[in-house]
Amino acid sequence: MTNDPAQVEQVQKCFDCDWNREPFHPHEDAGLAWSPGYARHLVCKFIDRAHKSLDVQHPKFAEPVILERMLAAIQRGVRVRILCGGKHGLHQPDLMYSFALWRLMHQAGAKVHKQKNLRAHAKLLVVDHKQALLGSQNFDQPAFDLRREVAMELYDAAIVRDLTTMYECDWETSRKYEPPYPVGEPAEEEEDEFMHDATLMHE
């Protein structure tokens, strides 16, 4: 994915620090969104770059700051599409938060679809079909503030094109999704379409 010396150096430094249980203090200008650290800030800045389109593939949506930046994108005319997995792999309180925030995004004008069959573990944002952010962070507070996570900004045209193609394939096989009311019971189709696995959790 990368041969950028600064990024490779940061990844190696992080591994060494975690291995030795030493503090890790990355610098922001390498294009890596580290958690704990400045990942939330970098993700927000990435969303703010969108002028035409923002494609999102995330299983969880429990972070109000990200919601605010996506709503701002819609207000400035950006087409926002969200691919999620419905309740699959979500547990309370993330299930309630995700349903509520997906509903707000839908009401604001975003297109929300539910993937069918296998879900992706990697989390993806694509801006204007020109740049991507690919990594491990869910949109929730533990992923940003408590766990070691990382995402990478990608600008290589061939890589972004491949990621966009995969997103479009997943979008074409998905269906329009209207999340249930957060404190209500999910519809039967939530179970019938793809059996909920109680042992699976998007961490």
Language-model features, listed with the residues they occupy:
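A short, well-structured juxtamembrane/interface segment
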Residues: 35-43
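DNA replication sliding-clamp ring fold and its partner-interaction surfaces
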Residues: 42-52
